[in-house]
Amino acid sequence: MIVLKATQDKVLAVLQSVAGIVERRHTLPILANVLIRKTGNALQLTTSDLEIQIRTTAELGGDTGDFTTTVGARKLIDILRTMPGDQTVSLESQQSKLVLKGGKSRFTLQSLPAEDFPLVQESAAFGPAFSVPQKTLKDLLGQVSFAMAVQDIRYYLNGILFVAEGKTLSLVATDGHRLAFASATLDVEVPKQEVILPRKTVIELQRLLSDAGGENQPHIEMQFANNQAKFTFGGMEFVTKLVEGKFPDYNRVIPKNHKNSITLGRAPLLASLQRTAIMTSDKFKGVRLNIEPGTLRVASNNAEQEEAVDELDIDYGGDTIEIGFNVTYLIDALANMGQDMVKVELSDGNSSALMTIPDNDSFKYVVMPMRI
């Protein structure tokens, strides 16, 4: 049976949309495979790592009929990448193997039985569905994902908190040193739901989501259950397990009523920090900010007695403050805000700083100071 027959670019795009979660080496060899299910003209591809399952349906030609098998996903992609985009390729079943043909090339691949592929059991208790433009969710993820912890023993920090309540969707991430919050308005009102999405899920969603805008921009539908989240978009169904545990009360972490605030251009501040970061210690990455009426001075030095000083003119008439930060934490936030102006609020040299967008509550970033 000819399972599919289409140009290389079409086949590769469909395979790549589901293959991001596939590991080359796994304790279960079949998890390195993609589950192929042909029903009539429709071809369904499914991958899983036991935590996440991605499924997409496409029409890629071939014979009409019913057929199921599994084959190595990465190997198939590696072969397809070596072929021209406009070349017609076909995948044929021959006994227990699959044969990939393209031009004068022929590849015989081993398959494993479809019935051995471990499908994720979907929850029967998903909450009400709601949707946002894919670009909106991609932007929100970009504004907070850099603050996720990496392999923290506090496992609930290794991901992003999603909070849907009323007509607001909020995303929060923290690694204990900094906290990023971003929110967007929903078209419908939803009951309060809170879930923590794992780090791998977040990274995969960012890869797959479209950033196309405009009137007909594609949407993503979301549903949450106690132990799962489901996302439906672009012909794909994305089901993921959740991180168990209690996320910190982010409202208590976000400081209020700072005595001093500066509003300045995001790009000049980012450029100043990137310049002074060159002279920081590889280990500590610390910069000092000296803030006084009219001037913001950014300084750094390292163990080789080298130093950098950069000054910015600011509209400021508050207290004189000297405070240290991990420069990477500041750069991460400024690089992902996507706005022209930034507001920095401070109380003194020993308290956390709050970065926001002027006259906009949709983004908040809290960063702890650092002794230098």
Where are these regions (language model features)?
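Structural preference for solvent-exposed beta-strand-turn elements
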Residues: M1-I372
